[in-house]
């Protein structure tokens, strides 16, 4: 026994030195450093062979392999880890096990010298000190959010960006690199960052959980799938569309298109009038409708008039109407907007074959000749034309205010002061 005794004493001495260093580190932070107490502790650790300075009762060491016990009462598991004496927790390192035991004993040696905060873990104290210094080293790569704790950053990603950490094999690229690749593809396709949300026809709204739950796996394929779906939609519609037109195609514009389709279904009496020999004359004699069924003869005349749109034209004579809630009948450019419709609306008429429209700028389809303004949406064009008066195009159809020119007319609606005269 005389030969085995120095081994546990050396181990106990090393363990006491470790505890002393941890206590000294805490005292350095709190500003209460005492060199005399440290010297006494070190001296007492070298001279005494009992365990007066430790919380654990057992000092004896058994070198028998079948005993399963280590110095200071720590039990080893079958895989060699140190097991907690209070629960089933096991750890390979002694320092980690000591931190875990402090949960059971309630010891909190790491204290803040600026406030009453205390913790059993040194990393918790470091994170707490950032609240005093204002340091925020953790930054979200998707927005400008910064925080002082990593757990707050993870909570921000789940709550704000609907990002769930993926367990298992990680992808070869990090999330920051994935975002860079996505933005590069977006810039090459000519879209802005807004296109990440409005890129899924026909609903045009992609909910974030659909593509951000598996952020690092799914995002590189979003742009390609969306681009293929846009290509298919442009091929099936019969009219080539620009990417910017798809950006404008939000759910509000889709509702406007649906309203245009419903308004394009005329009553039976209008069908009888539309089937008269002089179709163009009949439509010129009644107020502007949101959408009218167009015949191939009308479409051919419209395509011929579009080629001559650069030359100034005089407006057609307007019929005399005393009602204000109707839009005026515009000139040739207005006829183009009245007779030319989107392919989905023109195909909804079973009696007339779908004409193939020539490739042209969609903005030229809705033109106000009075204000010299172009509208890509027929609903907005109809609302705008309803603001013009019949007898005087620069007379407000809401309050009856007479304006001098198109600039005065635009300023009147910009101010929004419609007082009834």
From Swiss-Prot:
Its main location: nucleus. One of its GO terms (molecular function) is protein domain specific binding. Keywords: DNA-binding, Metal-binding, Nucleus, Repeat, Repressor, Transcription, Transcription regulation, Zinc, Zinc-finger. Residues 229-238, 339-351 have a biased composition (Polar residues). GO terms for cellular component: nucleus; protein-containing complex. SMART domains: ZnF_C2H2 (SM00355). Residues 292-313 have a biased composition (Low complexity). SUPFAM superfamilies: beta-beta-alpha zinc fingers. InterPro entries: Ikaros_C2H2-ZF, Znf_C2H2_sf, Znf_C2H2_type. Residues 35-55, 229-249, 292-358 are annotated as: Disordered. One of its GO terms (biological process) is regulation of transcription by RNA polymerase II. A zinc finger (C2H2-type) spans 82-104, 110-132, 138-161, 366-388, 394-418. It is found in: Nucleus. Belongs to the Ikaros C2H2-type zinc-finger protein family. Transcriptional repressor that binds the core 5'GNNTGTNG-3' DNA consensus sequence. Probably self-associates. 'Pegasus' was the winged horse in Greek mythology. This is Zinc finger protein Pegasus. It comes from Gallus gallus (Chicken). The lineage of its organism: Eukaryota, Metazoa, Chordata, Craniata, Vertebrata. The gene is IKZF5.
């Amino acid at each position: 026994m005389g030969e085995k005794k120095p081994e546990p004493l050396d181990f106990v001495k090393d363990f006491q030195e470790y505890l002393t260093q941890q206590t000294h580190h805490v005292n350095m932070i709190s500003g209460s450093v005492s060199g005399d107490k440290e010297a006494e502790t070190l001296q007492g650790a070298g001279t005494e062979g009992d365990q007066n300075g430790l919380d654990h009762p057992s000092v004896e060491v058994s070198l028998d392999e079948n005993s399963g016990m280590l110095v200071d009462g720590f039990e080893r598991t079958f895989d060699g880890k140190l097991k907690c004496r209070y629960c089933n927790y096991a750890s390979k390192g002694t320092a980690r096990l000591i931190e875990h035991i402090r949960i059971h004993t309630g010891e909190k040696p790491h204290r803040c010298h600026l406030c009453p905060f205390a913790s059993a873990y040194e990393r918790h104290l470091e994170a707490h000190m950032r609240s005093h210094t204002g340091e925020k080293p953790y930054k979200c790569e998707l927005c400008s959010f910064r925080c002082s704790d990593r757990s707050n950053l993870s909570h921000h990603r789940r709550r704000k960006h609907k990002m769930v950490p993926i367990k298992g094999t990680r992808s070869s690229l990090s999330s920051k690199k994935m975002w860079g690749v996505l933005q590069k593809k977006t810039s090459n396709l000519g879209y802005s960052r807004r296109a990440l949300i409005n890129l899924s026809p026909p609903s045009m709204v992609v909910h974030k959980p659909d593509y951000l739950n598996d952020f690092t796996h799914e995002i590189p394929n979003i742009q390609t799938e969306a681009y293929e779906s846009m290509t298919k939609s442009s091929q099936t519609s019969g009219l080539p569309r620009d990417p910017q037109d798809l950006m404008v195609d939000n759910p509000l514009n889709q509702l406007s298109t649906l309203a245009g389709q419903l308004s394009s279904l005329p009553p039976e009496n209008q069908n009888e009038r539309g089937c008269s020999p002089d179709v163009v004359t009949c439509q010129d004699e009644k107020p502007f409708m949101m959408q009218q069924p167009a015949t191939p003869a009308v479409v051919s005349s419209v395509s011929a008039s579009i080629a001559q749109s650069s030359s100034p034209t005089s407006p057609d004579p307007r019929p005399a109407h005393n009602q204000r809630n109707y839009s005026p009948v515009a000139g040739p450019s207005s006829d183009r907007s009245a007779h030319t419709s989107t392919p989905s609306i023109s195909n909804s008429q079973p009696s007339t074959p779908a004409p193939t429209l020539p490739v042209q700028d969609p903005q030229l389809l809705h033109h106000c000749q009075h204000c010299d303004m172009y509208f890509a949406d027929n609903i907005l064009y109809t609302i705008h034309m309803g603001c013009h008066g019949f007898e005087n195009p620069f007379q407000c159809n809401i309050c009856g205010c007479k304006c001098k020119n198109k600039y005065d007319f635009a300023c009147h609606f910009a101010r929004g002061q419609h007082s009834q005269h």
